[in-house]
């Protein structure tokens, strides 16, 4: 499949991003033994971060769009594979075995795309300038799309498996006069 280089980059960014959040929070100090060299004292103590430029916003927007495009590409491939599985299932008995393979391939594409999107979103939330709520909404949308796909495939496969008509055994006690339970006339 290739493209393994970006996983290393995402892992590095995730380590850099979450390194501080995994450590216990430091207690605020009010001077004490360290004097004016303690954190929170000095000319930059109350300084705010520099304002975000238009170039930074454009970069963040492009990164978000590229990230979403990658997920949509995986999801499209999963839908395409599932559609081929549906067609294969309808063709012949030999196609039924192949259809399960196509459904599995579609599921792998959908799961891989959703997982890589969620991991990338968590790792690149800072450079994308996304709030926690925005990232959670993105992951929720991906989960909803994946669950919709899984439900559609599950219902379709269940419908195909239940397509067998059960014929009750005729022990001679049933009368053939008059309509049956469904209201159909008796066969002639």
Curated annotation (Swiss-Prot):
<keyword id="KW-0812">Transmembrane</keyword>
<feature type="transit peptide" description="Mitochondrion">
    <location>
        <begin position="1"/>
        <end position="96"/>
    </location>
</feature>
<keyword id="KW-0597">Phosphoprotein</keyword>
<dbReference type="InterPro" id="IPR026801">
    <property type="entry name" value="TMEM160"/>
</dbReference>
<keyword id="KW-0809">Transit peptide</keyword>
<dbReference type="GO" id="GO:0005739">
    <property type="term" value="C:mitochondrion"/>
</dbReference>
<feature type="transmembrane region" description="Helical">
    <location>
        <begin position="102"/>
        <end position="122"/>
    </location>
</feature>
<protein>
    <recommendedName>
        <fullName>Transmembrane protein 160</fullName>
    </recommendedName>
</protein>
<feature type="region of interest" description="Disordered">
    <location>
        <begin position="21"/>
        <end position="53"/>
    </location>
</feature>
<feature type="region of interest" description="Disordered">
    <location>
        <begin position="168"/>
        <end position="188"/>
    </location>
</feature>
<feature type="transmembrane region" description="Helical">
    <location>
        <begin position="135"/>
        <end position="155"/>
    </location>
</feature>
<keyword id="KW-0999">Mitochondrion inner membrane</keyword>
<keyword id="KW-0472">Membrane</keyword>
<dbReference type="GO" id="GO:0005743">
    <property type="term" value="C:mitochondrial inner membrane"/>
</dbReference>
<keyword id="KW-0496">Mitochondrion</keyword>
<feature type="modified residue" description="Phosphoserine">
    <location>
        <position position="48"/>
    </location>
</feature>
<keyword id="KW-1133">Transmembrane helix</keyword>
<comment type="similarity">
    <text>Belongs to the TMEM160 family.</text>
</comment>
């Amino acid at each position: 499949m290739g493209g393994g280089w970006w996983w290393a980059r995402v892992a590095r960014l995730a380590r850099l991003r979450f390194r501080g959040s995994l450590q216990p929070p430091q207690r605020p100090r009010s001077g004490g033994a360290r004097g004016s060299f303690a954190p929170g004292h000095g000319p930059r103590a109350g300084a705010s971060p520099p304002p975000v430029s238009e170039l930074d916003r454009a970069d963040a927007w492009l990164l978000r769009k590229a990230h979403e495009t990658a997920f949509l590409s995986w999801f499209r491939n999963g839908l395409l594979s599932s559609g081929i599985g549906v067609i294969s299932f309808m063709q012949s008995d030999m196609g039924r075995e192949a259809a399960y393979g196509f459904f599995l391939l579609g599921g792998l594409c959908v799961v891989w795309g959703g997982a890589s999107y969620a991991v990338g979103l968590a790792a690149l939330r800072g450079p994308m300038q996304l709030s926690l709520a925005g990232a959670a909404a993105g992951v929720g949308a991906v989960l909803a799309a994946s669950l919709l796909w899984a439900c559609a495939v599950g219902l379709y496969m269940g419908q195909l498996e239940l397509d067998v008509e059960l014929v009750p055994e005729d022990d001679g006690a049933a009368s053939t006069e008059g309509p049956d339970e469904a209201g159909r006339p008796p066969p002639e």
